[in-house]
Amino acid sequence: APARGENTDIPGIVVAFAERGVTELRGTAQVLGAGETAASAAIAAQRLGAECVEVYARRPERARALAERLGADVTAHALADWRVGREVALVVDTVPRGYSPEEHLLGDLGDTALLSAAYDPWPTPLAERWLAAEAPVVTGLDMLLHQAVYQVRLFGGAPIDEPVPNEPAVLERMRAALA
């Protein structure tokens, strides 16, 4: 039989945002980084309804390659050009150890949600700013927790969209193990 795989990052990101009250996006999603977690985050943002996704990377050619791979409504930019604007609904930081921009680049965060995928060190520089502004923050561990739930489903032989028996209890035990 041909090999088959599932991406558990995408639904894990979507559910982690939902847990923080972010279930639908209106506006732009910005993804910092151009690796595989960034690709999953961009797709998750599209599934949440982002009107467009902007990918920012230290090497703009990597951002362009990712944007081309993901297709319509994804644009590529240099990380040095990143700014949070009023139209931004969501920022996902996949830069290893977290991105640390100049303070003036952030402006008023309002209700802009952040997923800071790095979990060590915590909080990341961006997460510190978001937490201080009392804006929604999803941690890298939140993402990994929900990704793991989808993996448990698959490892048990169930379809990815079919909860396992007692899944809320499984989730709480997994969460307790992370504490």
Question: Language-model features: where?
Answer:
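Glycine/small-residue-rich loop that forms an oxyanion/phosphate-binding "nest" at active or ligand-binding sites
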Residues: 1-27
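Short, conserved loop/helix-junction motifs that constitute active-site signature segments
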Residues: 24-25, 47-49, 105-112
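Glycine-rich Rossmann-fold phosphate-binding loop(s) that bind the pyrophosphate
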Residues: 33-35
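N-terminal Rossmann-fold NAD(P) dinucleotide-binding loop
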Residues: 38-39, 123
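NAD(P)-binding Rossmann-fold cofactor-contacting core
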Residues: 48-70
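Adenosine-phosphate binding glycine-rich loop
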Residues: 117-179
